[in-house]
Amino acid sequence: MTTKWGTLALGLVALLCGMTPCQAVELKVSREALQRTLRQQLFSGPDGRYFIKGSAKSACWVYADDAQLSFTQDRIVARIKTHARLGQSVHGTCLGISLAPTSEVSLEPYGEGETIGFRDAQMIKVSDRRELNFLLAPFLSRQVPSSMKVDAAELMRKALEGSTVSSGYKVTLDKLKIHSIQIHGDDLVVDADGDISVK
């Protein structure tokens, strides 16, 4: 008997949600998921490298790899290993110096429409070499934040795709508007308004 009432209550909730927009939505994005996004979008080259200057075939080059993210207070810190051969290319050999510093940039998460973005890039640690910093600064302050953008609405739509099989109802996200983003422990917590339809 209890199962019948539970099913009826679930059906009524689904019916009401299908008729009116369901407003409050909270989405949690883990640090690992964000790190995976950065690696897939920026470090998708051979061996997970992103060439800032030159290529794998160049005598002299600068590339970044091994991106690690951590959450510190209300900011995200990206720690990236850099490898560089700086100098002059002579007959296919780089005459100069080799460097392998670790760089860090701190970013503030924010919401814009359906997207989780990152801004206010602050360099925490870069190389001691001015010629390398000339290449690293734009990479850390522009390319890293733009490659970490997450379409929150798309994430939710993918998560809801299997709803018909699991519940018998087709649940779809029609609209999402992000209001705030906060860091809680190892998660990025996104508060948003969303219109969800149940059919």
Locate each region found by the language model.
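Bacterial N-terminal signal peptides that target proteins for export
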Residues: 1-9
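Bacterial N-terminal signal peptides
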Residues: 9-18
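Extracellular/lumenal and peripheral-membrane lipid-interaction modules
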Residues: 23-199
